[in-house]
Structure formats: structure tokens, C-alpha cells
């Protein structure tokens, strides 16, 4: 019984030595579905907005290059990425605040997917599949 208490207390002490980091990884996979199956969208675009949730941008209009507009108020993405022929889009985010991610399909023009992640969500993994 004493050994169990000792192991538990040592574990807690070790945990306190790990520095907190504002970095977290994000990995996004974008696909599209057609009559022939599901395929990787190799030219998809991903836009990341720090400090907002998707509910914060209800009513905004989506413009080219990930710009969001509401009555002349514009929000531009903090990060712009393209799949560039890769199956997934992976990056290291330099902070741990809430984020919203908008993914734009290159296969289905004008189609976007949107999701948000809370500060504690780590690592971030998102799979977006656009259909007909």
C-alpha cells in the first residue's frame, strides 16, 4: 500500500516538471466524393482564424482567399494553406487559443466546410469530405 502511494506521488511530481506549451499540431485531410468513390482533394485550401469560434461569424459572407465579410467588416485568416498535391495538410500552430478552420474544396467550386476547436483540443485532426 505504501508503494502505491509513493508511485502516485512521484508521478504527480514528474507531471509538474513538464513545461506548458502554446504549440499544438493540426492535421487536416480533405476529400471529395463523386460517382467513382472518395478521392483526395489535392488542391484544397485551408484557412485558420485565431481567437474566434464558428458561431462568432454567423452571418458573414465568405469571399475569395478566406476573407469573411459582414457589412464592410472583414476578417482575414491568420493562416492560409493549400494542399499542394499532398494528401494531408499538417502544421504546428504557434498558440493554444480557440480557432476556426474553413476548408475550401477545389473539386466542388464554392463549397466550404467549417469547424472550430477549443483551446484544450490537441492535437487537432480534421477530415472534411465534400459530396455531390
Predicted regions and their residues:
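Generic marker of residues within folded, mature protein domains
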Residues: 18-20, 34-38, 79, 91, ...
